Amino acid sequence: MKTIQFIRLTTAFLCSAAAFAAEPQEPGFEPILNWRNLDGWHVSAKTGHSRASKNKTGGKWIVKNGVLIGRQDIPGNGGIVITDEQFGDFEVALEMRNDFGPDSGLFLRSTEDGKAWQAMIDYHANGNLMGVYGEGLGGKPNVANYHFGEKVTEVKAEEAPVPFPVLEASWPLFWRHMEWNELRARIVNNPPHITTWINGVKIMEWQETEVRHPAKGGIALQVHGGGDHTREFVRYRNIRVKRLDKKQ
């Protein structure tokens, strides 16, 4: 069974890698980041991650050759960059090439002060990618089916509502550190149903049972506060969204 699973994942990896290289425009998706600047986005310093600047700045964010680059602007000071537009039901996809160390996150239906359903981008020891977390929502849910070890090539599967679909030994093949990998998240309804993927493979699925957050909000990316990550970067490109709201 493990051999069959490994072959399936390897095939999925090779197919998805070829697709990413060509970067075709998926039906129904529209880009929400241009190649030059943050038009359509703005930096918010209203989250708790901007306390080091007394909420005056929200980290350092620039766009260079189509890549959104973020870091702490002073030691310990992060924040979010959030879309001007608000979204309800949608699927968002992007490519990531972050340094291993800074804590980030993909915020779904985010408020200006960073309350959101988060698809985690905790790209550091003991962190995970694409688990689901209630940012500013009492820390619930907090579900992940694996965590990183001390090295980016090491992962440990954990018990979760959705089993970890990748063999631990195959992780270095499935996830290509310091290359572009695709992350994807879908959120529909309220209470929301959230699904996440890495490189085309479903990682987590979560059904919330209560209405605890507005049905619309921004799409945001985070640089976490704390520590000193002024010389470590998060990088995102090819950010695109597919609207899934039911037509009236």
Predicted regions and their residues:
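Positively charged n-region of N-terminal signal peptides that target proteins for export
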Residues: 1-8
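Carbohydrate-interacting regions of secretory-pathway proteins
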Residues: 21-248
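Bacterial N-terminal signal peptides
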Residues: 8-18
